[in-house]
Structure formats: structure tokens, C-alpha cells
Design a protein with these regions (language model features):
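Extended hydrophobic leader/signal-anchor segments used for secretion and membrane insertion
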Residues: 1-163
Length: 163
């Protein structure tokens, strides 16, 4: 009899945990991507440049308050270096950085390199004898991009991607 009571208590506890998870999933407004096939190691992702209170959604439009920042639009090409995030034909919303404080680890930036605009992720922020610089890398590239990205080279910071 004692064993049966213990088993029933354990089953009740487990059922309560499962029911709590289901209720949380049903009533939560946050979406949480699940990663069940590969490591849950944290990877760099973009800084939250736009806060929830800066976004207004109505039936037929989305408004984003950029706090006076200068806005740009971009259409990406398919180089495969940022596949999974950016691909051929995707549209990006970008703002022009005003200071180095606008640029964060994980941000996707467009920078000038050999007369081209390259769009890669910031993986390092450093200082040397010439001052501040960023290290960039395409998400699917093995090595970081050659050279240092000085502030003058970084033209845009991506804050939204429209698929």
C-alpha cells in the first residue's frame, strides 16, 4: 500500500510538471527556438537595437521608432557566407552607426572592403595603437575576415531582416 501511494505521488508530480509546461506553452507570448539535434552552446547573435516599446504593429503595417537614427534598406545577394540568416533576395533594415557605441558583438554589419560592401557578423571588438576596430566573419566562413574594420569602414548595422 505504501509503495502504491509513493508511485501515485511521483506520477502526480510528473504529471503536474508536464501540465505546467503545456500551460506555459499555450499562454506564453514568447517564442523559444528549440535545438534538439546539436549543441546548446551559446552563439553570437545581434544586439537588441530596437526595444519592444519602439515597435507598433497594426492590421496592415509595422512602425519602428528609430529614435532619430538614419535608416537604410538593403537587398542581399547569395554569397553563402551568411546562409541561415541572409540569402539572395532577402531584404534588410539597417541604420547608420553614429559612434562605436552603436556597434556590439554579434551585430551584422555592412562594411566597405575593396570597393565592395560586405555583410558579416562582428565577432570581436578591440583597440590597438590606431584606436577601435571590429573583427568580422561570415557565419559560415571558417576564418575571420582579413584585416580590421575601423569605424569609418562600417557603413550600416542590420536591425531587421525581412524574408
Amino acid at each position: 500500500m505504501k509503495r502504491l501511494l509513493i508511485i501515485l505521488l511521483i506520477m502526480n508530480f510528473v504529471l503536474g510538471l508536464q501540465l505546467g509546461a503545456v500551460i506555459d506553452d499555450v499562454f506564453s507570448r514568447e517564442e523559444e527556438p528549440q535545438n534538439i539535434l546539436i549543441s546548446n552552446k551559446e552563439r553570437l547573435s545581434s544586439f537588441d537595437h530596437i526595444k519592444e516599446n519602439q515597435i507598433k504593429v497594426s492590421d496592415d503595417k509595422v512602425e519602428i521608432d528609430l529614435d532619430g537614427r538614419k535608416l537604410s534598406w538593403s537587398r542581399y545577394t547569395g554569397s553563402n557566407s551568411m546562409d541561415g540568416v541572409l540569402d539572395d533576395g532577402h531584404n534588410g533594415l539597417e541604420f547608420i552607426p553614429e559612434t562605436i557605441n552603436d556597434i556590439h558583438l554579434g551585430d551584422i554589419v555592412a562594411f566597405r572592403y575593396d570597393d565592395r560592401l560586405i555583410v558579416h557578423r562582428v565577432i570581436g571588438l578591440e583597440y590597438d595603437e590606431q584606436g577601435w576596430y571590429a573583427i568580422t566573419k561570415g557565419d559560415n566562413n571558417i576564418q575571420p575576415d582579413p584585416g580590421k574594420r575601423r569605424f569609418k569602414d562600417i557603413k550600416f548595422i542590420t536591425f531587421g531582416i525581412i524574408y
